[in-house]
Amino acid sequence: MLKPQIHKPHLVNKLPLGTPFIPSHASIASFSTTSLRTLSVQKCYRRYIRYTSSNIKAIMPDSIGKSIRKKCVVTVQPTISGALTAVTVGLLGTVADSVSDFLGRSFLLELVSSDLDSSGKEKDTVKAYATYDELDKESKLYKYQCEFEVPDDFGEIGAVLVQNERHRDAYVKNIVLDEIVTFTCDSWIHSKFDNPDKRIFFLNKSYLPSETPEGLKSLRQKDLESLRGNGEGERQSFDRIYDYDTYNDIGDPDTDSDMARPVLGGNEHPFPRRCRTGRKMTSTEPWSESRTTLPFYVPRDEDFAEIKQITRGATTLYSVLHGVIPALSSVLKDEDKGFPLFRDIELLYEKGVDIDPPPDSGTLSALPRLVKAITNSTKKVLQFETPRIKHKDSFSWFRDEEFCRQTLAGLNPYSIQLVTEWPLMSKLDPEVYGPAESAITKETVEEEIKGFMTXEEALEQKRLFLLDYHDLLLPYVNKVREIEGTTLYGSRTLMFLTCTGTLRPLAIELTRPPNNGKPQWKHVYTPCWDATDXWLWKLAKAHVLAHDSGYHQLVSHWLRTHCVTEPYIIATNRQLSKMHPIQRLLCPHLRYTMQINGLARLSLINANGIIESSFSPRKYSMQLSSDAYAQKWRFDHEALPADLISRGMAVEDESAPHGIKLTIEDYPFANDGLLLWDAIKQWATAYINHYYPQAKLVESDEELQAWWTEIRTVGHADKKDEPWWPQLKTQQDLIGVVSTIMWVSSGHHSAVNFGQYDFGGYFPNRPTIARTKMPNEDPTFEEWEAFMEKPEDVLLNCFPTQIQATKVMAILDVLSSHSPDEEYIGTSMEASWEAEPAIKSAFEEFCGRLKKLDDIIDSRNRDPILRNRTGAGLVQYQLLKPFSGHGVTGKGVPYSISI
């Protein structure tokens, strides 16, 4: 039996170093702006005494036989202090951990053999204590060292067990033996005082379950079980448990009955599942989980707050939510006050808004782009950068052609669809919602295209396109109209594809369902030359833009990327071992998302949060997202080619470059996206075919099958019986599933996220709410006279209020920003990929394709023929350029949903 032995130490004097361990288990939401002051060990004793790396080693008793000495280095990443934590380092913890270093007991490591012994049992582990050695000045990482005496017959080392002897958890980057054998950890290791279980880390070599070395099989299963939990109790900050729950925590009925919200997830309101936290239920609603207090729970390895730069998205988002928004609310106290003049909107960029910093004003230090100090004053100014849409052309938002162009090359390219049937018909019950047939007629179309062709020819030649928010919004119109300060319609917007390949609008239909004895009201607006109808047309566009903004945020963005991805993350951690090749392929695409989603539930999508207070559906926003999930979401349509085909924006064509032919040739999002999709799929194909050379390996992989089953039946339980779920029997099945997940977390999310400030930062271009009804809907004499007297005032009153606009602008600025340490797709190679030559080569080819894509997009943006992506004053389409600098750049595709 191997026993650790402590040799007589060599005393070495060292200057005290800041501890590499965090002061508390703090998720992102525990951020304070108070600067963290680390208490120096020097206050306890004047000299730091440590053991050299040769002091502590595991030795073999002489009677056992020969052994090999192996040197081990443990690399620990320091945590970020300052604005990232609310708790200063406690003296007790500092002294206790320093004593651990003094005694040479920082980490207990145990090497595990991949082989069984001659009797078929697992071999004894080889143990050693690692103690602090130095701070690497170049990498700024802490090094701990020890030596092992490994028996000659130990066999190949396959895993290492780690126990953290300190009182605080530590983020361990890697463990290296003899500078050759590497265990990539990138994981928080809890203190044994919080959890006595040892952490398990495997070599960088990937194994299918059937190929697992005999000596590691039980550890592989044990490690998975440690991540699943038992579904009971409240999760603690040091836990690594991944489990499922419904969205039963966005309401706050204990504070106010009007803040109660229905549970999302279940037969009544289908929705993907989130990570379970186990908090107690509310006292007023036993089915609703109580609102969280800071910090909120995410599995420990999903919390990157203390190890990423201060400008990491979650940090800055937190700073806006808990620093800027309260400051704005204290200044803009009249919640109903709009902008009296367009000039007042301009001043947001020229002068900004003076704000009183909150008591904990350090949060604002994370926002140098937004918040500027005022000379000789304690006040600060919230000054917005001019968005590109306004900087390039101040009047572009007013033009019809730009209104249409942005459906192809703007922030929400996921809604436009081909018209395939005429007349346009609603699928809603006419007994409840009124006549189903649209008021946009054949004559309307022919009048607008001025005899260029008949309506039948336009339909046959695929010239008619639609934004259709009629059936999704109409059931909410009467309910939303009961809320003061907002209104809603069902809407349809019809567009025509011109001979130059651009779109122009033909008509907008706004509909109000029957209510309180009033019949259905609907009206068709068209581009006009006379003053009155032209202003009605502009107001109708404002309503449609508010609908599109809401759909973009609640469906294209939140639902189809953030929300549906969380079950993928949970299932991947619960069912795929850390040594599984698919786990390692997906890992970079699944980082950071759960932390962002937790913050969204805390302050963005919650009752009376940013979304509910600033978007047209108000308190019904998340129910609308649930309806979209029930009616529209299909996994098999989330791959880009399938999405385009489902909307009629492409047809299958084996002779076309991507296997599909676009209905609109100059569709910037689709053209760039298909190149990125192909690159992702080719990378996934090479990777999967390497590990699964035969189809039977896919079907017989019990971890893989359990993973896919759990995604379908638990993570997306409300869709579990749908016939469209792909099977997982062949390599092609697996390539399709994995490529879709990789695309959604990278390309899809980037396309709908990183242009938010460029397009929405000037809110007349994308208002989030329409506050007033159309002037011609049952007008009073006074209302109509006010419109006729000064229609500009009516438009400004329809736009968001000052507090609504500035809150959203501040949020969009952060959501659109890349951090300096952003991990762009194809720019960093996972250690497990590099360890396998064939995978390393495939990844390098993937990187090469992405670099070509970057150049291709630049070339396309210089082509004057492509009018939908370039032209005088246009914001060129570059959202799918893979690489970017930091800040708000309007380009760059991170691996994952990192903000």
UniProtKB/Swiss-Prot annotation:
Q: Name one Pfam family in it.
A: PLAT
Transit peptide where, by residue? Answer: 1-57
Q: Give start and end of each Lipoxygenase domain.
A: 206-899
| Bound cofactor: record note | Binds 1 Fe cation per subunit.
Which gene carries the instructions for this protein? Answer: LOX2
- Entry-linked InterPro entries: LipOase, LipOase_C, LipOase_C_sf, LipOase_CS, LipOase_Fe_BS, LipOase_plant, Lipoxy_PLAT/LH2, Lipoxygenase_dom_3
Chief location of this protein within or outside the cell: plastid
Annotated protein name in UniProt = Lipoxygenase 2, chloroplastic
Query: Domain of life here?
Result: Eukaryota
Q: Where is the PLAT domain?
A: 83-203
Which GO MF term does the entry hold, naming one? Answer: metal ion binding
Subcellular location per the Swiss-Prot or TrEMBL entry: Plastid, Chloroplast
